[in-house]
Amino acid sequence: MIYLVTGQQKLFENPNYKTISIEESLQLMKDCKALQYDSETSCKNFHLGNILCIQFGNKAKDFQIVIDCTTINILLYKDILETKLLIGHNLKFDISWLYNYGIIPRKVYDTMIVEQLLYMGFPRIPVYPDRYEKYNYDFPYKIVQSDKKGTYYELSFSLQALAQKYLDINIDKTVRGEIIWRGLDTSVVLYAAGDVTFLEDIMWKQVKACKEKECLVGAKLECDFVPVIAYLEWCGIKLDEKQWRAKMDKDKEALNKSLQALNNYAIKHPKLQKWVKQDLQGNLFSGYDTESKWTVDWQKKESIKVVKALGFNVSTISKQTNKESESIMEKVLSSQKGIDDTFLKLYFDYQGCYKICSSFGQGHLNIINPKTGRIHTTYWQIGTVTGRMSSGGTTDEDLAKFKKLPINDCKNLNFQQLPHDAVTRGCFVSEPNNLFVSCDYAAMEARAGAEVYNEKVLLDEFLYGSGDTHAAYAKVVFTEELKDVAVKDIKKIRPDLRNKVKSVEFEINKIFI
């Protein structure tokens, strides 16, 4: 049975649902241990919009309750939201909105997160329907129509995909994009109720699958983390704008110096004269400027021709197409020592400065939320195929509209890859009368990996040494460079090699994970 709680007066009863009072709705949910939960909002940014309605469902009592939050105080349901087990899909989103009201859910089960755990490591590759049937695949999918590839299935963790997989039910999401202008009409009420009808059934199917794969404890741990990561997004972090602008000015100065040094080297290089221009003719108005000019933009494709002219091999295999292509990225050129090491140093210095200016500049100021004065990015608790957390990668369209900026100028930032220097990190500050508390699990993956592999070098480092696994890996990989440096001193003496070896370390640990 579908119920609606609203402060709006209805002239006629609706045959599709029954309007009840706040007290009646609370009484219905009073004895429920678990409730299916969802919410509809005016936008995606929880600091710029409003909750339009919240929905509860319970299978045993066979009800779905839709509460009109435009006319009903959501705090009347605070006790329900904080004491019951909430079963939802992508609950991080819904919980973030509740924090605006001081409502802090304690117990949650997230069907999306559990499904991601069950299919951790499964690739997002096109699978055609005939192959899906032939090889008895069971992963949840969305149907993709492509002019080049035809119709194929792609891994998806949407509620529609899970309902189709576990219950063979098609959930229509057409109404979702119309809620803001439609209001709580009959279609919206039925749609909202539908989102809290099948979550419990999906949960029990997943619990069975978790038992079979022996990952039930992991599923609980992931679900317990959902309110935490929601709080992390909701809180955000304060950026000292004055310090950041000063950093940007210094970064631009460093970029200009590195570009000038690179261009000057290229201008004087005998193999690169075809890209050097001199104005020997001049004119009556601007006069003469016989100084040599470099004509290639190092960020454009033409720069590949320049690097090839110096004798470097720029061939590589594209990850996107799996075909041979050309690239002058550092990972392609760094191994080609002895061809023109001076150029490589100047070029890598320039690219490093360019990366700093383009990735850690105005974009951080654009994404500051004017309502909170903080940066709120997006975090994905199972953001990689190995289960590691990731952040950023999306665009905050609501914030862009609010600040009247182009949509692409408000990109959520990757806060897991900030430069290590004190100047950059010093721009992120605590509020007045508050302090930062920083803590970290020391080499968690490496410790687990060392035990699984019974790797004596790492075990000895943990038990009797400095415990610095990054340095221990660096010692093994860069034998010549670090032959006279103790593991405990590598972080201080050669932090560059210690940082560079992390990719090797994480790749090895990924195998056992």
Q: Where in this protein do the model-derived segments appear?
A:
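Short, surface-exposed loop/turn microsegments at beta-strand edges and helix-strand junctions
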Residues: 103-106, 416-420, 426-430, 451-454, ...
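Short active-site oxyanion
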Residues: 80-86, 292, 433-437
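Active-site-proximal helix-loop-helix substrate-binding element of RNase H-like nuclease domains
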Residues: 2-17, 45, 49-210, 221, ...
